[in-house]
C-alpha cells in the first residue's frame, strides 16, 4: 500500500519571494552558455544581435537565444519543422516531440490541481540554493516563485513562450557548460521527453559535484496506456524514475508522495531529489 503525505494547502503567488532570474548578459558574463553544435563558449557577435562560438552563429528572439543545433534550425519553416518525412534521426526525434506538444499540456495555472502541485513542489525545493536550471520552464516569472530567494534561476524551454527571457533549446542537448549548475529541475516535464535518459544524463553533466536533480512527476499504478494520451511520451512507474536516477550514479536524498491532485486513484504525485557525488 503506497503511503501519501496529507496536504491540502495551495500555492500563493508572491513575486517578492522568488529566485533571482539571470539575464542573457549574466549568462554570458559567467561563461555559462555553450554552442549546441561545438559546445564551445558562446559570446555576443560583433553586431550584438547574435551569439557566436567563433564559427557558428545563433539568433535571438525577444532577447532569448535560440540554441538548437544548426541541423534543426536550417530546416525550420517559420520556427518549426515541416511535417514531412525526415531522413535524419535528430530531425525525426524533434519532429515527434513537436507533434506531441501541439495540444494543451497543463492544467490551467490557477486551477486547484495546479495550485496543490505548486505548493507541494515549492515545499520540496525549500533547501535548494545556487544556480538552478529549470528544464521545460514554461513561464519563468511564475516558475521562479517556486524556488527559494537564495537561488539564481535560468529557464530553458523548446519554445519561446510569452517573450520572457529563457534559453530556447532542448533538454536533451543542453547548451550549458559542464559542472556549472547547482540544481537541474524537471517540474512535470520529464514525461514530455521521449529520450528522458539522455535528458537526465545532460542534467548530471551540467551539475557541479553536490548538485541536485529534482524531478516532479506523476507515477502510475495502473491504466498507464499511452494509446489515449496525445501529449506525453511516458506514464512513469515510480521504479522507472528512481532507477534512472540511481543508474546515473545519483543518490536519492528526498522522496515525497502525494495523492493525485486531480483525485485519480491510478496515479500519484512523486517528488524526488537526487544528488551528484562525483
Give the predicted meaning of each segment.
Residues 4-103:
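N-terminal, positively charged/glycine-rich alpha-helical extensions of SAM-dependent methyltransferases
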Residues 104-130:
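Conserved alpha-helix/loop element of class I SAM-dependent methyltransferases that forms part
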Residues 130-173:
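Class I SAM-dependent methyltransferase SAM/SAH-binding core
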Residues 185:
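A conserved beta-strand element that flanks and buttresses the S-adenosyl-L-methionine
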Residues 188-189:
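Short catalytic micro-motifs in class I SAM-dependent methyltransferases
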Residues 197-212:
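A short glycine-rich, Lys/Arg-flanked "PGG" loop and its adjoining helix->strand segment in the class I
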Residues 214-242:
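Conserved class I S-adenosyl-L-methionine
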Residues 248, 254-278:
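Core SAM-dependent methyltransferase catalytic element
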Amino acid at each position: 500500500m503506497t503511503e501519501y503525505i496529507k496536504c491540502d494547502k495551495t500555492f500563493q503567488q508572491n513575486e517578492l519571494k522568488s529566485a533571482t532570474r539571470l539575464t542573457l548578459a549574466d549568462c554570458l558574463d559567467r561563461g555559462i552558455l555553450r554552442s549546441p553544435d561545438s559546445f564551445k563558449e558562446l559570446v555576443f557577435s560583433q553586431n550584438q544581435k547574435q551569439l557566436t562560438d567563433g564559427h557558428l552563429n545563433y539568433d535571438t528572439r525577444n532577447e532569448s537565444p535560440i540554441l538548437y543545433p544548426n541541423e534543426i534550425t536550417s530546416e525550420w519553416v517559420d520556427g518549426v519543422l515541416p511535417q514531412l518525412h525526415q531522413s535524419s534521426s535528430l530531425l525525426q526525434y524533434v519532429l515527434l516531440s513537436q507533434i506531441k506538444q501541439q495540444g494543451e499540456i497543463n492544467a490551467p495555472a490557477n486551477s486547484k490541481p495546479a495550485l496543490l502541485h505548486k505548493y507541494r513542489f515549492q515545499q520540496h525545493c525549500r533547501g535548494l540554493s545556487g544556480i538552478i536550471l529549470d528544464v521545460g520552464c514554461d513561464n519563468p516569472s511564475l516558475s521562479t516563485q517556486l524556488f527559494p530567494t537564495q537561488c539564481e534561476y535560468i529557464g530553458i524551454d523548446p519554445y519561446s513562450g510569452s517573450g520572457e527571457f529563457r534559453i530556447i533549446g532542448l533538454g536533451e542537448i543542453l547548451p550549458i557548460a559542464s559542472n556549472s549548475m547547482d540544481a537541474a529541475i524537471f517540474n512535470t516535464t520529464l514525461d514530455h521527453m521521449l529520450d528522458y535518459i539522455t535528458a537526465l544524463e545532460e542534467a548530471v553533466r551540467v551539475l557541479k559535484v553536490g548538485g541536485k536533480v529534482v524531478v516532479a512527476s506523476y507515477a502510475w499504478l495502473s491504466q498507464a496506456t499511452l494509446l489515449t494520451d496525445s501529449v506525453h511520451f511516458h506514464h512513469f512507474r515510480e521504479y522507472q524514475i528512481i532507477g534512472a536516477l540511481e543508474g546515473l550514479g545519483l543518490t536519492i536524498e528526498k522522496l515525497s508522495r502525494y495523492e493525485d491532485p486531480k483525485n485519480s486513484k491510478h496515479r500519484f504525485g512523486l517528488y524526488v531529489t537526487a544528488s551528484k557525488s562525483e
